[in-house]
Amino acid sequence: MSSSADTHYQTLSIEHKEGADWLTLNRPDAFNAIDQIMTEELLDYFGKLYFKHEVRVVVLRGAGKHFCSGLDLNDAGHFGTSNPADMRGQRLISEIIMRMRRCPQPIIGLIQGAATGGGFAFALACDVRYAADNARMNVAMAKIGLTGCDIGISYFLPRAVGASSAAEMMMGGRFVNAKKALRMGLVSEVVESEDLEAAGQSLASDMLAMSPMGLRMTKE
């Protein structure tokens, strides 16, 4: 299998394998929290995908033990210094979500460890979600005086789990573990942590075996 790596980004790692981009959120020391640089780089990456016909599938994952812990509240000037800064950060992340949905490539989300707040929004914006058995997900924004509705969660979550369960997660802030996520329909499959990459590779291979135009039009 041929592959190539993209070293253009600081907070993202991209490996291209036979028609699939393996896009890794790469701030493991910060649990892949979303800072200003990651926001700008994700906007750039997903904004360019429409014209990258050599990329037919995207596999999104997090480096280290966690998928994404949400907004980096220590990122001065972007999040955490004031409510206006927090809201601006949320609006930029909402644009990432829109670009994820607009791109014609299906996105497979591989979720391990924590997927909270903005990280949970990234997971919801994926077309298919697989979870490791240690995955935990929640909507954390309301706990810090923000809304869980501005970055796509209030749109995608009720469609995945129903209105009552979505309201419970958005207003209660409770964590959902992998087994419950599977029962709720949040994820398609739960596997052991060491098998998560193989599960993603298997589905990516199935997608790549489809007609390129058929796959693209189905996502669109």
Language model features by range: what are they?
Residues 26, 32, 64, 70-72, ...:
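Conserved phosphate-binding and hydrolysis motifs of nucleotide-dependent enzymes
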Residues 23, 27, 42, 60, ...:
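Terminal peptide-recognition signature
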Residues 98-215:
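Crotonase-fold acyl-CoA enzyme core
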